Amino acid sequence: MGGLFSRWRTKPSTVEVLESIDKEIQALEEFREKNQRLQKLWVGRLILYSSVLYLFTCLIVYLWYLPDEFTARLAMTLPFFAFPLIIWSIRTVIIFFFSKRTERNNEALDDLKSQRKKILEEVMEKETYKTAKLILERFDPDSKKAKECEPPSAGAAVTARPGQEIRQRTAAQRNLSPTPASPNQGPPPQVPVSPGPPKDSSAPGGPPERTVTPALSSNVLPRHLGSPATSVPGMGLHPPGPPLARPILPRERGALDRIVEYLVGDGPQNRYALICQQCFSHNGMALKEEFEYIAFRCAYCFFLNPARKTRPQAPRLPEFSFEKRQVVEGSSSVGPLPSGSVLSSDNQFNEESLEHDVLDDNTEQTDDKIPATEQTNQVIEKASDSEEPEEKQETENEEASVIETNSTVPGADSIPDPELSGESLTAE
């Protein structure tokens, strides 16, 4: 009957074996921690109680039981010299006992871990994909660690601030493999691809998790629909961007820095932060006077943030020639001149203006390298412009000279004849 029942008794499955091994491993790990705590506790109590007892006995013997003879005192102090050695030997024995227990525990723990590793290798070779994936996720310590480390990063990427989304997305894009697997190749048994939710980690040796990146991109992209510029899909492939527009002041500043900032009137409290309009990242700080007129490129998303205001520009001053002004003032102060002198002065003025224009054109040719045709055109235009007011001035001077001559020359009737006046006097 026993043989029949033994035949009907089913063999434990790999999951049950792994569960029993896992329980034993947990028990051994707990025992190891407990053994270490007991070792520290026993050694600490031994040192504490022995030191208190040693001091107390020394005090009592010194006050009441100390003999007068030297030999008796020496015999009395010998136990006090031997007591620390005894306590030290007891401490070493306790440490040796607990260390032996810890070694036996570690050996058993290593054996169980090696058994579990062998069973997991057999599972990866023999079991189907789905069962192998479940067993590895449940009993493989590497997959457990990956699963424990993954949800905080995924949750942080989902609930992150707008300034951190691009950095996490670029990190996820860099982790993607450049060559996807071909559809003709069947999935090997030890390289499973996780069909489950995106948060579950894949088996060890499998391809990188592609399901996390679309979820992140789908959660991140709608936030930037209303932003001034749409995000670029291959942003993680950009080279490192330009330096920040303004240096970031250190957070920890000494007393001397604070005093200098107070005297100069500079510091973080007197500056404005440069925040990117697209990814809301911090790009340094700018002075109050420059904040409205500064344009910068983000160091994280490379978005060009335009200036809030355009800097006002002063009106352009008119061109002024000191020599021409002296000539005009001199001609106005002298007054009207004869027509010949006016013409000569005008000719001199035209020659001087032409020479001055030629010199200016030569200097401009050396500085700006203007072609020869443009220089001649400019000289002709300036000469024509200078001749027009000079012709007007000539006509005005001629009219004024004619009027003066008419006023100074008397009429023929009004001129007295000296001969007639003399004859009239003699006749009288």
From Swiss-Prot:
Question: Mind listing the UniProt keywords for this protein, alphabetically?
Answer: Coiled coil, Developmental protein, Disease variant, Endoplasmic reticulum, Epilepsy, Intellectual disability, Lipoprotein, Membrane, Metal-binding, Myristate, Phosphoprotein, Transmembrane, Transmembrane helix, Zinc, Zinc-finger
Renumbered zinc finger spans (C4-type): 276-301
Q: Topological domain, Cytoplasmic: which ranges?
A: 2-45, 99-428
Q: In which tissues is it expressed?
A: Expressed in neural precursor cells, where it is detected at the growth-cone-like structure and branching sites of neurite-like processes.
- Residue ranges annotated as transmembrane are 46-66, 78-98
Q: Does the keyword Endoplasmic reticulum apply?
A: yes
Q: Which GO terms describe its biological process?
A: blood coagulation; embryonic digit morphogenesis; embryonic forelimb morphogenesis; endoplasmic reticulum organization; endoplasmic reticulum tubular network maintenance; endoplasmic reticulum tubular network organization; limb development; positive regulation of endoplasmic reticulum tubular network organization
Q: Where in the cell is it found?
A: Endoplasmic reticulum membrane
**What is the protein's membrane topology class?**
Multi-pass membrane protein
| CC annotations in GO | endoplasmic reticulum; endoplasmic reticulum membrane; endoplasmic reticulum tubular network; endoplasmic reticulum tubular network membrane; membrane; nucleoplasm
Show the ranges annotated as biased composition (Pro residues).
Answer: 185-198
Q: What is the effect of changing residue 231 to A?
A: Inhibits phosphorylation and degradation in mitosis and prevents homodimerization and three-way ER tubular junction formations
Q: Which residues carry this modification: Phosphoserine?
A: 114, 153, 177, 182, 194, 217, 227, 321, 353, 384, 414
Is Metal-binding tagged as a keyword? yes
> Mutating residue 231 to D leads to what result?
Inhibits phosphorylation and degradation in mitosis but does not prevent homodimerization and three-way ER tubular junction formations
- InterPro entries (alphabetical): Lnp, Lunapark_Znf
User: Assembly and partners?
Assistant: Homodimer; homodimerization requires the C4-type zinc finger motif and decreases during mitosis in a phosphorylation-dependent manner.
Q: Which family does it belong to?
A: Belongs to the lunapark family.
General function of this protein: Endoplasmic reticulum (ER)-shaping membrane protein that plays a role in determining ER morphology. Involved in the stabilization of nascent three-way ER tubular junctions within the ER network. May also play a role as a curvature-stabilizing protein within the three-way ER tubular junction network. May be involved in limb development. Is involved in central nervous system development.
Q: What is this protein called?
A: Endoplasmic reticulum junction formation protein lunapark
Tell me what organism the protein belongs to. Answer: Homo sapiens
